[in-house]
Amino acid sequence: MNLLPNLTLIIGGACSGKTSFAENLTLNNGPNNLYIATAEPFDKEMKSKIDLHQKSRALQKWKTVEAFHNLAETLDGMKEVKFDTILIDCLTMWLTNKFLKNKDLPQEFSRLVESVREQKMKLVIVTNELGYGIVPDNKMAREFRNLNGQLNQQIAAEADLVIQVVAGLPRTLKGSLPKVSNDY
């Protein structure tokens, strides 16, 4: 099928439908896909959400790898394996994991962008847009929001296709949206 360009970024707010849209887009690109999940189950609510996502993916026969911290290394390790598309869900959760560990984030961003650039398979990356809300009331939250925006800009600059999802509806910000089926 091969409908997608090399790098597609799907961006949207919380519960905007971005993950469902990204999954459908990926499945339309071919049947042999890898799902890189980045959400770490740090509390009961998150564990429940992850369980729901895992059950949904199992029905669609996704191959899944978890990459809570080592996303660039995980992508690098996929160079010898052949998939139609690699879906990363989600960049903001990966950033959360790194932020909480106080890693050198600018260096981590550079490393990830380099891995994305070098990837030979089609990539679909899901991320959150945090800049539409109110300005956070504390320094740590403002710093996180700013870092998320910086990372999104770096990935969007590399992307061939950038799609914003609002209320389950896609809007193309960069590139051309391929015609896809909603049968998945």
What feature does the model see in each segment?
Residues 31-34, 84, 122, 161:
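Residues at the starts of beta-strands that form the adenosine-phosphate
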Residues 15, 40, 92, 130-131:
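Short, glycine/serine-rich, charged loops/turns that create anion-binding
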